[in-house]
């Protein structure tokens, strides 16, 4: 591939559509500074995919769009198009079959770029892939912009390796390896996550296996623990009852002894109080005397401390005086030493000044001779330069004419070849079949109509779905509420029935009844239905008869009674024996009322009558208790009436207390709370623990059963409503889902048809556009061939004239060069002498400044020594005066007086302490007597307190263990055989503790461990299979990376060797000698950087950074051209690469470019006349209108004349 033209529109300063033709292999771009030449380089870099605004000399990517000028408005978009000649089919992939390839990029103000290849919209990656490995790209070595040569030569080793990789064409391997590494990294991350999950899951499986074993052990231990704990509570309860009786007897005996001791202690308390007052007065007198002694002792201590401080101050002053004497001697000696140093350095300073004077005179003498020698050398240099310029101009003109001739020949040949290719391509263009396109469009229209129908159906169905879902949700909530209520009612009913069943089992009695076949006889309370509020009244009258076994058959009841008489039951038992006759008479008697004939009342025999019964003036109304009880079995009605005969129900027993004497014998009144009033007593019967509440619970069970039946009917209805709502919502949801699936299918078909129609339409447009483009290109080729033939004829005539003039100018140049060499030698010798004198003068002046600095330091030190000596003498006098002022005689006299006062106060304190001792002895005697009495009574009080605590503890223990047994639902009958063995409490305690310890040692027990273990094992098997798949994928990816690395290493190593060899050959050609090479910074070429070693002729520099700017530029050019020879890019762009080069090196550079142009097309920007001479074609860039660049035709001769200021 080679670049045939470059099209710009709206890009930076190229606001108008501009076409730059590049038919030759050496195309120069010329023009004044700031006219926009470098924008051509930026345009090529931009269209190849550059995304960094800084690389395009802008702050943002929108800066490449023309932003207006003084006469132009900003434009909305920028576009750049590269057109390549692909006659040899070197393009990559599907584009190799095109004779021409155009690459285009468009950017608008929104900041969005679009890329096209042959007018087909592509991705940026597709553009980069097209040139991958060719040396072209946004950051490849084939586009050398301003300053890039210096950046290449100063690049890091890793960056230079990147250039080598591009030259080797391994960047595509790098991309493949990067993608493979990404997939490998993802696979390893997934494997690491799987390993973590599998490890965690494995640990959990081990844990679950242990938990499953623990759960079985837990059930076994828990059953044994419950049994032993209940047995222990039963033993402790029995022992607590025995302890309670024993402690109560001991407490009564100890209480009587306490009362006698309390009277005697009262008398002794009175005597103790009088003795305590006398002791307090003596103690106050001792306190006063002791305070006086403390004050005297404090004064003595203060005076002793003061004398000690005076002695220490005197010793410190004497030590300071000795130190000051030493300091005075030191500073005196220091001042004498500094005076001797000052004299020595003064003499050295005078000698240094004399040497500086002599050196300065010699330097001035040599410097006066240099201008004359330098002027002579400059004259010879000017003569040689003039001769060289004349020869260079002539040779340049000769090369230009040769270049013009060769360029014209190549251009003609290229135009003929291009015309043939374009004509062939025009004949081979085939557009799409119009019939197929019409069929596709018709099918697309039909699919769109079908799509609209389905969308309407879906739009109609979707609004109905929320209503159906809401109805389903309401039905579901109602059904759940009904089920919750059913569950609550069943739980309540079942709990009550269990309580009734436990009451009916009757502990030990149940076994006895079962053994004698009496367990099927129902208790009496099951046959009764009591009016609300009178349960406790009926229980108070019936008491144990409430649990009496009943039978409607009198014979069966008598048989049960005979069984009881034959074998005594283990607990209380009643057998109801219904009478065969006489029941009506008893009910008639009940209707006579509870009072004797003197005080009759109105009696109601039923609950209904009770509400209307009116009391007489004598007593309130009453109701026969039997009238409040309904009997389910009519055969037992008489029996119940017999049991309740003589019992009357009253609302308020308080009203009957004054009338109790009038009650008839064997008659009683019963209140709602179960209190019973007879003629002689008011009795409150505590509820029987076994039968208490059975009537109320039975009534509640019957109510719950009725309510439960009603809710079950409601639950059936709610379930039917839920099924209907679920069916409606499910059908509607399924219909919507089906419509959505059909809609997605049709949309996919519509999209596919749209794509196909668009492809056919675009193909038709591209074919037509390409035919028109080829016609325009062929017309341009005809005009270009005519112009190139005229250029060929003119170049051949000018070439002959320039050859004769060049030979004469070479002879004049050789003579001028010899004269210049002699005069340069004389100038170098004079400069060496001047430098020697300057160094001598510099050393003398440095020595002079050093001596002056030393003298200043000595003067400062002398001043400091004098100041220090004066300070020491002054402080010495002050300390001597302070020592004379120190006196301690007055403090010694005051101390003696204080000691005498302290002696007197010690004697007074001793007398008062004796009086206090006598009072204390009297108080002690009385208190000892009281304490002895209290001590004698204390054991008795303690005994009483202990007994009271023991009694409370026993009562609490009984209640506690009773409560525990009830809460644990312990079956005492089942525990009786174990209790008969008289187990010891300590043994049971150890067993319970052992079992509890073993249960606690098990820790938290997961009873669902088995299910969790099965689930975890299945999941681990699935994860193990996934891990195997990932390991195989990782092995495959690692093999691919190793294969890529191997191929890359081999290709990169070959490239390195070839480029290094070519670099070593090109470097001496550009420098006229020297050596250069590339050196790896590591052993592995894939990771190692590359350093450049370059040594021009006569230099042994250790680093390329020591080279001049021109030498660095030539070195970088040699390196880039070495890469070109290995992997020639389709074209190379050079932006003022020759700027830092002198004429000689510019000529070498131009010759090198010319030789390289046989394989690579070069497009260069230059201001150098020498470089322009080598161009086969010149493209001029001007900016006649401010801010707007244009391309113009350039006459090579006129360009050379404008580039040479001397020719103007």
UniProtKB/Swiss-Prot annotation:
Q: Subunit info?
A: Homodimer.
Task: Spell out the family assignment given in the record's similarity comment.
Answer: Belongs to the SMC family.
Q: Which gene encodes it?
A: smc
Q: Which GO terms describe its cellular component?
A: cytoplasm
Question: Which keywords annotate this record?
Answer: ATP-binding, Coiled coil, Cytoplasm, DNA-binding, Nucleotide-binding
Could you state one GO biological process linked to this protein?
A: chromosome segregation
Q: Any idea what job this protein has?
A: Required for chromosome condensation and partitioning.
Q: Which SUPFAM superfamilies match?
A: P-loop containing nucleoside triphosphate hydrolases
Q: What is this protein called?
A: Chromosome partition protein Smc
């Amino acid at each position: 591939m080679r670049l045939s033209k470059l099209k710009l529109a709206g890009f930076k300063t190229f606001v108008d559509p501009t076409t730059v033709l590049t038919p030759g292999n050496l195309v120069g771009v010329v023009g004044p500074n700031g006219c926009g030449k470098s924008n051509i380089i930026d345009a090529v870099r931009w269209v190849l995919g550059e995304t960094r605004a800084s690389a395009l000399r802008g702050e943002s990517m929108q800066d490449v769009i023309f932003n207006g000028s003084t006469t132009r408005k900003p434009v909305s978009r920028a576009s750049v198009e590269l057109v390549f000649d692909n006659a040899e089919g070197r393009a990559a992939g599907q584009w190799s079959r095109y004779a021409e390839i155009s690459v285009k990029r468009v950017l608008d103000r929104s900041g969005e770029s679009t890329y096209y290849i042959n007018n087909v919209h592509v991705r940026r990656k597709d553009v980069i892939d097209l040139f991958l490995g060719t040396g072209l790209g946004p950051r490849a070595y084939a586009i050398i912009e301003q300053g890039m040569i210096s950046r290449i030569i100063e690049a890091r080793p890793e960056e230079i390796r990147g250039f080598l990789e591009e030259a080797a064409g391994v960047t595509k391997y790098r991309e493949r390896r990067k993608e493979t590494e990404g997939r490998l990294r993802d696979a390893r991350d997934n494997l690491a996550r799987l390993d973590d999950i599998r490890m965690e899951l494995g640990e959990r499986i081990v844990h679950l296996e242990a938990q499953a074993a623990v759960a079985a052990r837990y059930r076994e231990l828990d059953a044994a623990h419950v049994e032993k704990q209940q047995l222990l509570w039963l033993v402790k309860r029995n022992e607590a009852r025995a302890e309670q009786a024993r402690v109560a007897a001991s407490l009564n005996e100890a209480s009587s002894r306490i009362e006698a001791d309390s009277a005697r202690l009262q008398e002794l308390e009175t005597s103790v109080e009088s003795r305590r007052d006398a002791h307090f007065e003596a103690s106050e007198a001792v306190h006063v005397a002791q305070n006086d002694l403390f004050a005297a002792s404090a004064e003595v201590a203060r005076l002793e401390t003061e004398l000690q401080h005076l002695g220490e101050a005197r010793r410190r002053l004497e030590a300071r005086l000795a130190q000051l004497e030493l300091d005075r001697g030191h500073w005196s000696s220091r001042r004498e030493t500094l005076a001797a140093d000052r004299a020595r350095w003064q003499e050295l300073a005078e000698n240094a000044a004399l040497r500086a004077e002599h050196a300065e005179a010699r330097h001035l003498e040599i410097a006066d001779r240099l201008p004359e020698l330098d002027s002579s050398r400059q004259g010879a240099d000017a003569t040689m330069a003039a001769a060289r310029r004349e020869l260079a101009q002539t040779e340049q003109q000769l090369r230009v004419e040769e270049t013009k001739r060769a360029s014209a020949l190549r251009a003609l040949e290229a135009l003929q070849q291009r015309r043939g290719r374009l004509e062939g391509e025009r004949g081979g263009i085939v557009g799409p079949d119009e019939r197929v396109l019409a069929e596709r469009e018709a099918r697309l229209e039909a699919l769109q109509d079908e799509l609209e129908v389905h969308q309407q159906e879906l739009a109609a169905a979707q609004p109905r779905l929320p209503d159906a879902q809401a109805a389903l949700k309401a039905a579901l909530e109602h059904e759940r509420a009904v089920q919750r209520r059913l569950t609550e009612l069943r739980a309540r009913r079942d709990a009550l029935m269990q309580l009734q069943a436990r009451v009916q089992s009757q502990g030990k009695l149940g076994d006895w009844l079962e053994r004698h076949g009496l367990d099927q006889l129902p208790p009496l309370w099951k046959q009764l239905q009591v009016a609300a509020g009178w349960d406790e009244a009926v229980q108070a009258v019936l008491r144990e008869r409430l649990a009496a076994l009943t039978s409607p058959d009198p014979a069966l009841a008598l048989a049960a009674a005979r069984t009881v008489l034959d074998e005594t039951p283990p607990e209380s038992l009643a057998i109801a024996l219904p009478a065969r006759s006489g029941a009506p008479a008893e009910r008639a008697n009940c209707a006579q009322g509870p009072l004797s004939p003197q005080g009759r009342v109105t009696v109601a025999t039923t609950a209904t009558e009770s509400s209307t019964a009116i009391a007489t003036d004598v007593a309130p109304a009453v109701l026969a208790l039997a009238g409040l009880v309904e009997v389910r079995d009519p055969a037992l009605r008489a029996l119940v009436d017999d049991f309740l005969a003589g019992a009357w129900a009253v609302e308020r027993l308080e009203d009957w207390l004054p009338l109790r004497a009038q009650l008839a014998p064997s008659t009683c009144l019963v209140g709602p709370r179960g209190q019973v009033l007879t003629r002689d007593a008011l009795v409150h019967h505590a509820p029987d623990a076994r039968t208490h509440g059975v009537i109320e619970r039975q009534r509640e069970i019957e109510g719950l059963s009725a309510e439960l039946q009603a809710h079950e009917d409601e639950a059936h209805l709610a379930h039917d409503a839920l099924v209907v709502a679920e069916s409606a919502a499910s059908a509607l949801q399924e219909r919507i889902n089906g419509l959505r699936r059909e809609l997605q299918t049709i949309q996919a078909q519509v999209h596919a048809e749209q794509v196909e129609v668009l492809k056919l339409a675009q193909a038709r447009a591209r074919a037509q556009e390409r035919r028109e483009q080829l016609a325009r290109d062929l017309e341009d080729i005809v005009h270009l061939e005519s112009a190139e033939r005229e250029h060929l004829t003119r170049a051949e005539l000018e070439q002959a004239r320039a050859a004769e003039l060049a030979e004469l100018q070479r002879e004049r140049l050789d003579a001028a060069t010899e004269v210049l060499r002699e005069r340069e030698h004389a100038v170098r010798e004079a400069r060496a002498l001047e430098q020697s004198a300057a160094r001598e003068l510099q050393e003398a002046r440095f020595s002079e400044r050093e001596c002056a600095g030393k003298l200043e330091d000595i003067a400062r030190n002398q001043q400091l020594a004098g100041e220090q000596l004066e300070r020491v003498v002054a402080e010495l006098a002050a300390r001597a005066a302070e020592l004379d002022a120190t006196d301690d005689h007055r403090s010694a006299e005051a101390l003696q007086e204080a000691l005498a006062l302290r002696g007197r106060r010690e004697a007074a304190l001793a007398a008062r302490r004796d009086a206090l001792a006598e009072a204390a002895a009297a108080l002690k005697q009385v208190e000892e007597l009281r304490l002895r009495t209290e001590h004698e009574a204390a054991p008795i009080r303690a005994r009483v307190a202990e007994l009271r605590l023991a009694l409370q503890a026993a009562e609490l223990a009984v209640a506690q263990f009773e409560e525990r047994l009830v809460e644990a639902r312990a079956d005492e009958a089942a525990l009786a055989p174990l209790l008969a063995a008289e187990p010891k409490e300590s043994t049971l305690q150890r067993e319970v503790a052992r079992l509890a310890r073993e249960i606690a040692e098990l820790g938290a027990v997961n009873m669902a461990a088995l299910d969790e273990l099965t689930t975890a094992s299945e999941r681990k098997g699935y994860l193990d299979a996934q891990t195997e798949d990932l390991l195989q994928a990782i092995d495959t990816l690692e093999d691919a990376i190793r294969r890529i690395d191997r191929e890359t290493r081999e290709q990169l190593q070959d490239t390195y060797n070839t480029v290094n060899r070519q670099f070593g050959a090109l470097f001496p050609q550009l420098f006229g000698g020297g050596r250069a090479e590339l050196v790896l910074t590591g052993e592995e070429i894939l990771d190692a950087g590359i350093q450049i070693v370059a040594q021009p002729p006569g230099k042994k520099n250790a680093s390329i950074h020591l080279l001049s700017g021109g030498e660095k530029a030539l070195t970088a050019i040699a390196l880039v051209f070495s890469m070109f020879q290995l992997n020639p890019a389709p074209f190379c762009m050079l932006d003022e690469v020759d700027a830092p080069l002198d004429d000689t090196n510019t000529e070498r550079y131009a010759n090198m470019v010319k030789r390289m142009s046989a394989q690579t097309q070069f497009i260069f920007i230059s201001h150098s006349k020498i470089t322009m001479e080598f161009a086969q074609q010149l493209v001029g860039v001007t900016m006649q209108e401010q801010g707007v660049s244009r391309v113009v035709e350039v006459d090579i001769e006129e360009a050379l004349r404008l580039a040479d200021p001397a020719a103007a």
